[in-house]
């Protein structure tokens, strides 16, 4: 394969590229969600609004999972990080549809909230979520994730206008970047928040804890860390590779306020992500690797795998069942 750079692109953060293009991702069957009043938790709205909120959030997550499969299948001979993308789907859906102040949609650009996907190998989950948030266009997706015309990549290139605040690929780097953003935002007296998504395997990296120490020491309350704890990494179960004990307790020790939630309970995620206190927050989201796909759930081989025609058909059946259950 060959690395391609468009004329305006830097070599920094560019992934290995091959030829190819992506067809359109059809999301017309799922309604566009409306932004929810950020001053209210799900428990503070009436039952009808709460049910509608849950319905919207679950459909957003299904849209993301459908987007993951569609994009990966169009490059069926190229492996993608399907498992981690599906485990983080609910998190990015809730963030971008209901929690974050997105610059192009909700506020002045400088006042936007920032999302750092430190586990950048799962960027496939971000594309459909950013499309729904109007940060990227259908044309961007149509140009593909490989080749000289691509503006989206398997490992993202920094492009804040499209929602990519940092180039990705090397694990352990995102939280340090989030720390710098949080400090800069505070010094500018802005109310913006910084959300940083980590993987639990990524938390083996020492740089994560250096950054956590800095954030805790400076009490950067505008920084919220979300750990996608699917308990698996490239080589197997996290506990077998390097058992580091409770991630929540570690963040507590660095001065964070930590909370543990079901990472596929969209209302629990919504409430946890909306809260902001006088301390930085760490949300440990207990998830299932490959969530929503019968062949990929808790299957470490789908850490990085191809979506064949047969798997694609099975995925569509799985998502159809989930869609029907959501509508009941």
Question: What do these predicted regions represent?
Answer:
Residues 266-328:
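Glycine/aspartate-rich loop-and-adjacent alpha/beta segment that forms the canonical ThDP
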Residues 121-122, 230-231, 265, 287-290:
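Glycine-rich beta-alpha junction loops
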Residues 86-210, 216-217:
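Cofactor-binding active-site loop characterized by glycine-rich and histidine/acidic residues
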Residues 30, 41-122:
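N-terminal amphipathic, basic-rich helices that act as targeting or association modules
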Residues 113-115, 192-196, 223, 278-287:
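Generic beta-sheet signal
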Residues 163, 167-275:
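Thiamine diphosphate
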């Amino acid at each position: 394969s060959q690395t391609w750079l468009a004329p305006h692109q830097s070599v920094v953060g560019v992934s290995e590229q091959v030829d190819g293009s992506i067809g359109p991702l059809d999301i017309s069957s799922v309604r566009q969600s409306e932004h929810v009043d950020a001053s209210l938790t799900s428990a503070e709205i009436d039952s009808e609004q709460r049910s509608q909120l849950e319905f919207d959030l679950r459909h957003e997550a299904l849209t993301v999972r459908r987007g993951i499969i569609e994009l990966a299948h169009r490059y069926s001979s190229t492996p993608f990080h399907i498992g981690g993308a599906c485990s983080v789907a609910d998190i990015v859906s809730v963030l971008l549809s209901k929690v974050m102040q997105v610059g192009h949609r909700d506020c002045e650009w400088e006042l936007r909230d920032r999302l750092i996907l430190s586990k950048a190998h799962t960027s496939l989950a971000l594309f459909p979520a950013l499309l729904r948030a109007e940060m990227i266009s259908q044309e961007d997706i149509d140009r593909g994730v490989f080749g000289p015309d691509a503006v989206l990549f398997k490992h993202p290139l920094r492009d804040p206008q499209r929602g990519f605040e940092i180039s990705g690929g090397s694990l352990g780097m995102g939280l340090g970047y989030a720390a710098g953003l949080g400090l800069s935002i505070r010094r500018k007296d802005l109310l913006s928040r910084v959300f940083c998504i980590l993987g639990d395997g990524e938390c083996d990296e020492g740089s994560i804890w250096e950054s956590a120490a800095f954030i805790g020491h400076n009490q950067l309350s505008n920084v919220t860390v979300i750990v996608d704890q699917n308990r698996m990494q490239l080589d197997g179960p996290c506990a077998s590779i390097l058992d580091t004990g409770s991630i929540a307790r570690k963040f507590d020790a660095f001065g964070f306020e930590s909370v543990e939630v079901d990472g596929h309970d969209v209302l629990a995620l919504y409430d946890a992500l909306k809260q902001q206190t006088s301390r930085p927050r760490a949300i440990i989201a207990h998830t299932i690797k490959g969530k929503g796909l019968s062949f990929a759930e808790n299957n470490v081989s789908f850490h990085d795998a191809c979506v064949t025609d047969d798997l694609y058909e099975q995925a569509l059946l799985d998502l159809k069942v989930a869609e029907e259950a959501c509508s009941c």
